[in-house]
């Protein structure tokens, strides 16, 4: 905040970005940032207004960075662009005040000019068995033997268009439901604040594929409004399996795939790019739809990672690197023609 004293330029202090060491003055706990950095400026000796570094986009109305601001950085100033994956601490101010990189830092294609969706920390259920979101919003860890379901939604929603994302099943314990919710139904159905799974209870506002592979509790079913619409999707979830989701908000259809193959709807193998054999059909309401997951812990702590196109499952990069037809996103498997990664540029164009 304005006029707040920082540890920068004190001379006798180790300067850190993304890490706060409270050992000397607080409770001895060191905390770390779990998020994204874009352009990071530190100016020594001059106070500039925000308009020096950013401006309002005339088309979208969004605040965007000025990529080459006119700034005098001073002797100890620096400008981190994070544009070199092998030297994320390189100073672009001209001062050569380079930083040493520590920890498991990853370069991201998600930037203020094109943000990809992540898990939303504001959509977590509040209770004593709180799930933990990490890896810049791409990993969700539940609690072992909590017998408590939690729904977590994405940071971005869509009202129209065709969308694709991938979720990695990364545990042998509990259940993982992968799907989407109608935003207007969140509070009305209490499926965020109460102990609910996607598609659970008297909930006509969420749709999901349910996966489980724990102590005989092997499930692979479609779930909506507290009912199973398909008793067996013909796959067996295992640790490391990738569940694919195709959501068509132009025609009210949804499909799920498993490790690169669209699953059978009961009438035939789904073909999202032609609209054939959807796993669900629904009437699209005039409101936002949010990608979502729910986890339910028993016989092991449930965990999943999600990739909306950023190219990683947690800290692990995808092996393949397939983009959508607009050239955005990086996926393990093909989004198929006409389906797009969940990012702000695609939503501006298609959503």
Predicted stretch roles:
Residues 55-136, 326-351:
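Extracytoplasmic low-complexity segments
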Residues 1-6, 231, 238-266:
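Extracellular glycan-interaction surfaces
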């Amino acid at each position: 905040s304005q006029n707040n004293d920082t540890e920068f330029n004190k001379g006798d202090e180790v300067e850190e970005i993304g890490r706060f060491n409270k050992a000397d003055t607080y409770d001895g706990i060191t905390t770390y940032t779990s998020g994204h950095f874009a352009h990071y400026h530190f100016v020594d000796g001059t106070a500039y207004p925000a308009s020096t570094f950013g401006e309002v986009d005339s088309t979208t109305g969004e605040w965007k960075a000025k990529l080459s601001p006119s700034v005098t950085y001073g002797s100890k100033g620096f400008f981190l662009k994070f544009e070199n994956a092998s030297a994320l601490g390189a100073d672009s101010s001209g001062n050569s005040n380079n930083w040493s990189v520590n920890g498991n830092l990853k370069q991201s294609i998600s930037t203020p000019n094109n943000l990809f969706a992540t898990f939303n920390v504001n959509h977590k259920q509040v209770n004593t068995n709180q799930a933990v979101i990490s890896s810049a919003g791409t990993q969700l860890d539940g609690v072992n033997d909590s017998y408590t379901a939690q729904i977590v939604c994405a940071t971005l929603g869509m009202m129209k268009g065709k969308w694709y994302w991938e979720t990695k099943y990364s545990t042998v314990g509990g259940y993982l439901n992968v799907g989407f919710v109608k935003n207007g139904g969140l509070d009305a159905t209490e499926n965020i604040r109460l102990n609910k799974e996607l598609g659970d209870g008297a909930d006509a506002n969420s749709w999901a594929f349910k996966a489980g592979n724990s102590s005989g509790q092997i499930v692979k079913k479609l779930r909506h409004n507290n009912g199973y619409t398909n008793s067996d999707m013909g796959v067996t979830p295992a640790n490391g399996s990738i569940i694919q989701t195709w959501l068509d908000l132009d025609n009210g259809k949804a499909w799920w795939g498993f490790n690169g193959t669209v699953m059978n709807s009961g009438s035939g193998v789904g073909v999202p790019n032609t609209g054939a054999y959807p796993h669900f059909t629904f009437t699209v309401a005039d409101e936002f739809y949010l990608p979502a997951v729910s986890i339910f812990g028993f016989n092991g702590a449930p965990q999943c990672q999600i990739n909306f196109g950023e190219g990683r499952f947690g800290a692990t990069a995808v092996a393949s690197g397939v983009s959508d037809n607009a050239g955005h996103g990086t996926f393990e498997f093909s989004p198929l023609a006409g389906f797009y990664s969940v990012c702000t540029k695609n939503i501006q164009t298609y959503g």
